[in-house]
Amino acid sequence: MTDLAHIRNFSIVAHIDHGKSTLADRLIQETGTVQDRDMKEQLLDAMDIERERGITIKANTVRIDYTADDGQAYVLNLIDTPGHVDFAYEVSRSMRAVEGSLLVVDSTQGVEAQTLANVYQAIDADHEIVPILNKIDLPASECDRVAEQIEDVIGIDASGAIRVSAKTGVGIHETLEAIVKHLPAPKGTRDAPLKAMLVDSWYDSYLGVIVLVRIMDGVLKKGMRVKFMSNGTLHHVDRIGVFRPAMQMIDSLGPGEIGFLTASIKQVRDTRVGDTITNDRNGTEVALPGFKPAQPVVFCGLFPVDSAEFEDLRDAIEKLALNDASFSYEMETSAALGFGFRCGFLGLLHLEVIRDRLEREYDIELITTAPSVVYHVFMKDGEMRELHNPADMPDLSKVDHIEEPRIKATILVPDEYLGDVLKLCQDRRGIQQDLSYAGSRAMVVYDLPLNEVVFDFYDRLKSVTKGYASFDYQLTGYREDSLVKMSILVNDEPVDALSTMVHRDRAEARGRAMCEKLKDLIPRHMFKIPIQAAIGGKVIARETLSALRKDVTAKCYGGDATRKRKLLDKQKAGKKKMRQFGKVDIPQEAFISALKMDS
C-alpha cells in the first residue's frame, strides 16, 4: 500500500473536443504506463460509440506510477469523467472521489458551456484546480486571451496556466510536475472502519459486476464481507485490483487509493453510483453524503420496424440495462406500432447513445416515438400522479392542474447571434434570468420548460448560431403551467403513438402543422379520410385527404341523366359504407416524419 503523501487523485475537466482524452493518452504514454506498441488513440474510451463521437460516456480510470523531479515515486490516479450534461451525476460522484482537477481549455476556442458546468462541480467538491491551455501547436491558438477569459468567466488564477499540445507532447512533463506539486494528497485513516465510495460499475460476462471504488477510510482486503449501505446487501469480495489501464490484481486497497472489486454481483442495479461500501460487522454508521439514485428525465417508446424482431429487441434492451443502471424500461403496446418498450433516459444524448447502440451492436431497426418528459398531474381528489406517456393522461375533468419540469439553461454564444438565440428561447416559453459578456461572447441564462428542449432545441440552437453556441442545462424543479394532451385522429380513430403534451397557447399551431404533415404522408384511399387534432373532445385543426375516384359514368354516352345519377348515388353509398368499415394504413415513414417534425 502506498503512503498517503505520495498519492494524487485527479480528474480532467473539459468541454467536448477540447482534448481531454488525448491529454490522458499522453500522460499514460509519458510515464510508460502502457508500452508504445499497445498505445492507441482515446485509450480510456472503450466503447466504439465513444471513439466515433469523440465523447466519454462512462467514467474510466487508470493508475499511473510517476517518479518526480524530486526523486520521489508517486501514484497518480486519473478518473476520466464524461463531459456531457446527461451524465452530470456520474461526473459529480467522480469529482467527490478525487482531490484535484486539470481544467483543459482549447486555446483556439476558449471557455465553453460544459467547461463551466463541470468546473463548478469541481469547485463544489473543493478541488484544487490546475488550468491547462491545450492545442498550442495550432496557428489559431490565443493563449493570453483564453487565460484572461478563464479568469473573467470562472474566476480562478490562470497566470501560471500550463501551455500544452497533447497532440505533439509539448508541456506533458510540466503537467505531471504540476499534479505532484499543486494538487493535495488525499486524507484518510487506516485503522478506521472501511468507508469506500462506489464511483462506477459495469457488467463483465466473466467476472460479474466490476465495481470501481475510492477508499476514504480503512482497508479493503480480498476475502472480506462488505455491505452496500443504500440497500443493505452483503457481498463476499473475491477479487481486488487496479487499472493500468489493463486489470492488475492486488490483495488490498488502502485509504486514498482507487481500484476495483468483484464480488459475484449479478446486476448493475444492485451497485448504485455514489453508494457507500463498509464492513458487514463494525462498519461505519455514517454514509458518505450526496448519494441519490439516478432518475430518468426523458421518456420515449422504442418499437422494432419489423414486429418479428420484438424478442431480439427485448434481449438487447435487457443486456444494455445490465450495464446502465440509469436506463429504465417497461413493455408497452401501441395500436399503430405493435409491441415495444417505454424507456427512460437521463437526457437526449443518453437516448441517442442507447438507440445507436441498439441499432449498431444488435442490428435492430427502430422507430422512436416523440420524446416526452415526466409531468406531475394533480387530481382533484388530492392525488399526484407521474405521467410518463401522454397516452395515459387521465380524464381532464378529474385533473386539478399539471406541473412540468423546468431547467436552468446556460448558453454561450458569439454576440452577433445573440438576437436569434434570445428569440429561440422566447419562442420556447423561456424566461430570461441573466445576460453577461466575456469578451466578444455573451452568456445567457434562461429558465426553460424541459418539454421544449427535448424535442429539437439543440439542433435549432446550432443552426441559428452556425454551430458556434454551446449549451448546458440542469433541472431546477417543477412548475404549474397550462398544459393539455393533444390527440391526433385519423378517420375518427385516435393514433396513440402521435399524442403529445403541448402548451394550450401553442396547441392549435402545432396541431395544424401535424395534420398538414400527415396529409402529405398518408397515401390516398378509396374513401375520404379526415385527419384531426383534438384536445379532449374539441377538434382544433383538421385536414381532409380526398378519395381516389373511379369514373363510374364512363360507359354512359348520351342518354338519360337519371342513369348517370343512379350510378353516382350507388358509388356514393358504397364509399360511405367503405369509410365506416375501411381501415386506414398509416405507413411507418409517416410516423417517423411526423415525430421528427419541427416543433
UniProtKB/Swiss-Prot annotation:
Gene3D superfamilies: 3.30.70.240, Elongation factor 4, C-terminal domain, Elongation Factor G (Translational Gtpase), domain 3, P-loop containing nucleotide triphosphate hydrolases, Translation factors
Alphabetical GO biological process terms: positive regulation of translation
Keyword Hydrolase: yes
Example GO molecular function: guanosine tetraphosphate binding
UniProt-listed NCBIfam families: lepA, small_GTP
This protein's name: Elongation factor 4
Residues involved in GTP binding: D17, H18, G19, K20, S21, T22, N134, K135, I136, D137
tr-type G domain residues: 5-187
Membrane topology: Peripheral membrane protein
E.C. number(s) listed in UniProt: 3.6.5.n1
PANTHER family (alphabetical): TRANSLATION FACTOR GUF1 HOMOLOG, CHLOROPLASTIC (PTHR43512:SF4), TRANSLATION FACTOR GUF1-RELATED (PTHR43512)
InterPro entries with a match to the protein in the record: EF-4 (IPR006297), EFG_III/V (IPR035647), EFG_V-like (IPR000640), EFTu-like_2 (IPR004161), G_TR_CS (IPR031157), LepA_C_sf (IPR038363), LepA_CTD (IPR013842), LepA_IV (IPR035654)
Domain of life: Bacteria
Location(s), subcellular: Cell inner membrane
Gene: lepA
Keywords: Cell inner membrane, Cell membrane, GTP-binding, Hydrolase, Membrane, Nucleotide-binding, Protein biosynthesis
Function: Required for accurate and efficient protein synthesis under certain stress conditions. May act as a fidelity factor of the translation reaction, by catalyzing a one-codon backward translocation of tRNAs on improperly translocated ribosomes. Back-translocation proceeds from a post-translocation (POST) complex to a pre-translocation (PRE) complex, thus giving elongation factor G a second chance to translocate the tRNAs correctly. Binds to ribosomes in a GTP-dependent manner.
Family according to the record: Belongs to the TRAFAC class translation factor GTPase superfamily. Classic translation factor GTPase family. LepA subfamily.
GO cellular component: plasma membrane
Chemical reaction(s) catalysed: GTP + H2O = GDP + phosphate + H(+)
